């Protein structure tokens, strides 16, 4: 402004205007430079910043791609690890289930073993009992065989010495021979029926004295063998009364034969429901002891056998 005032004071207007124009252009140029510099500096900085950012972005993208690749690899590794872990867990679960099943099976086998042991003990006990029973059965079988032999011997003796035999039917028929000295083959018989716990005399070849009392005594004592012996004695008495001589001797020898007879007992069953049941069962049991109450319990003696032979000879 001082220049303008100096020019305005001494120069002309033209020069003044030219000077002012130069001054204005100079100022405009300076202001333009200032503006250009003001505008260019931030832009340059912005461009530089943008370039740096672009470079950083590119580098970040490269790093991002690398990170993505690493992430994919990590994911693949994770999948593999998870698969291995899953297989291990599945294997562990299978092992646990197998262990549990094995433990259950062991428990079942333990219970079965205990059960088998108890069954074995029971079987051993039963076998021991069966062996004892078998041993007793063998002993009993031997005794039964001996008893059968004794029974056959007794029956044979009665059949031979007394001509005695039994028939089953409606009741039991007892038949004797070797009673009548004149006719040794003459048969004497009587039939006894047993039913409702009562003995009944159905038939007899001879009308004997005291027969009703004998039947009553039989029902009281249930001693059928004694009744049979008494009946034979009654038959014998009826025949001895017919002999004129030696009747006492014959009676004594016949009594000796009866005394030497092996003891037997009879049990009858006269159920009439079926034809098979019509057959009465006759059981003959050899007594093992000698009794003082009956002479029939005495065993067979040699003298008795000799007497029976003489008796047959006399007849």
Curated annotation (Swiss-Prot):
Residues 57-91 form a coiled coil. Residues 266-275 have a biased composition (Polar residues). Keywords: Acetylation, Cell cycle, Cell division, Centromere, Chromosome, Coiled coil, Mitosis. Gene3D superfamilies: Chromosome segregation protein Spc25. Residues 261-315 are annotated as: Disordered. Its main location: nucleus. Residues 280-289 have a biased composition (Basic residues). The modification N-acetylmethionine is found at residue 1. It is found in: Chromosome, Centromere. CDD domains: RWD_Spc25. GO terms for biological process: cell division; chromosome segregation. One of its GO terms (cellular component) is Ndc80 complex. Component of the NDC80 complex, which consists of NDC80, NUF2, SPC24 and SPC25. Acts as a component of the essential kinetochore-associated NDC80 complex, which is required for chromosome segregation and spindle checkpoint activity to ensure proper cell division. Belongs to the SPC25 family. This is Kinetochore protein SPC25 homolog.
């Amino acid at each position: 402004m001082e220049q303008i005032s100096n020019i305005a004071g001494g120069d002309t207007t033209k020069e003044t205007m030219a000077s002012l124009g130069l001054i204005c252009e100079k100022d405009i140029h300076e202001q333009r430079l200032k503006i250009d510099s003001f505008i260019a500096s931030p832009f340059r900085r912005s461009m530089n910043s943008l370039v740096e950012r672009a470079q950083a972005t590119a580098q970040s993208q490269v790093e991002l791609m690398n990170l993505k690749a690493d992430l994919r690899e990590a994911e693949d590794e994770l999948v593999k690890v998870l698969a291995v872990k899953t297989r291990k867990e599945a294997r562990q679960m299978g092992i646990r289930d197998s262990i549990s099943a094995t433990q259950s099976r062991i428990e079942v086998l333990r219970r079965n073993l205990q059960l088998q042991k108890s069954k074995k003990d029971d079987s051993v006990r039963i076998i021991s009992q069966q062996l004892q029973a078998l041993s007793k059965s063998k002993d009993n079988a031997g005794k039964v065989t001996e008893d059968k032999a004794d029974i056959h011997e007794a029956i044979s003796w009665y059949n031979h010495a007394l001509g005695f035999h039994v028939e089953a039917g409606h009741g039991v028929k007892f038949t004797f021979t070797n009673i009548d000295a004149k006719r040794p083959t003459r048969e004497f018989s009587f039939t006894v029926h047993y039913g409702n716990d009562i003995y009944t005399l159905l038939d007899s070849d001879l009308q004997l004295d005291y027969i009703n009392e004998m039947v009553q005594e039989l029902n009281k004592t249930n001693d059928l063998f004694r009744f049979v012996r008494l009946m034979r004695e009654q038959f014998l008495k009826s025949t001895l009364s017919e002999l004129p001589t030696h009747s006492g001797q014959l009676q004594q020898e016949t009594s000796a034969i009866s005394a030497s007879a092996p003891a037997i007992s009879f049990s009858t069953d006269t159920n009439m429901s079926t034809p098979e049941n019509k057959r009465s069962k006759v059981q003959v049991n050899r007594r093992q002891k000698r009794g003082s109450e009956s002479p029939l319990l005495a065993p067979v003696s040699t003298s008795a056998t000799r007497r029976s032979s003489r008796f047959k000879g006399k007849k």
